[in-house]
Amino acid sequence: MIFYFSGVGNSAWVATQLAEKLADKLVSIVDYAGQLIHIQEEERIGFVFPIYSWAPPKIMLDFIAQVQLSHTPAYIYFVCTCGADTGKTPELFSAHIQARGWQCHAGYSIAMPNTYVAFPGFGVDKDSIAQQKIYAAKERIDLIAKQIQSNISNHYDCNEGGLANFKTYTINPLFCQHMLSANPFYTTDACVGCGKCQETCPIHNITIENGRPSWGEHCTQCTACFHICPQNAIQYGRFTKGKKQYQLHRFLPLK
């Protein structure tokens, strides 16, 4: 079984590819409502998620803390998608798994096109770079699937990058404290009230009121609404002005 969370779509694509190769069931964590999930005694459990500010998204860590499984997983691994580096995600993820009395056996990162646009200095990749990343990701998924099938243990293959401790244990808490807000989101006059942002929000945090999107209080900063808007009418304060959108489907299927 593979539990996944995805905002813009990169992690959903990776999780789908991985599930097909491993013949595993795919479960979106946003559909979890506290029910007992039945797994086999020897079942392998995977977690797939994007990296937000050099750590797993809070929604994924909350899910790990709350999910009720019928048996202790025999084998646990994670695959995270990121624009470049993960910080100390392997260490942080493993600590949350251990807090449940479980053991994480393996972890991987996969570089995917950048999607974060809600801060100065961050933006999407050029199309050529995005395409290269997706091609490389396809090959990496093949490698990861083979290693997971072999039940490889005590194996972490993540690009932590420089200043990993500082990024994960200093910057990320600040990000979670100050940036997980939808308040700066607004729409320009280009908005036509199509509702695609509402349909795309992975945590159902957007409603359409009087023909315009209204954001709730549970934003994860995935920025899916920004990227999906066909009019490019959604902005986040002054940080997204003039920035380009990213949509995975433009680069698929791979040729």
Residues of each region from the PLM?
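FMN-binding flavodoxin-like domain, especially the glycine-rich phosphate-binding loop
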Residues: 2, 7-14, 20-49, 53-174, ...
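Generic structural motif recognizing short loop/turn segments at the entrances and edges of beta-strands
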Residues: 22-25, 181-183, 211
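A mid-sequence, solvent-exposed acidic-amphipathic segment
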Residues: 160-194, 199
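Iron-sulfur cluster-binding cysteine motifs and their immediate structural context
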Residues: 186-187, 192-214, 218-220, 224-241
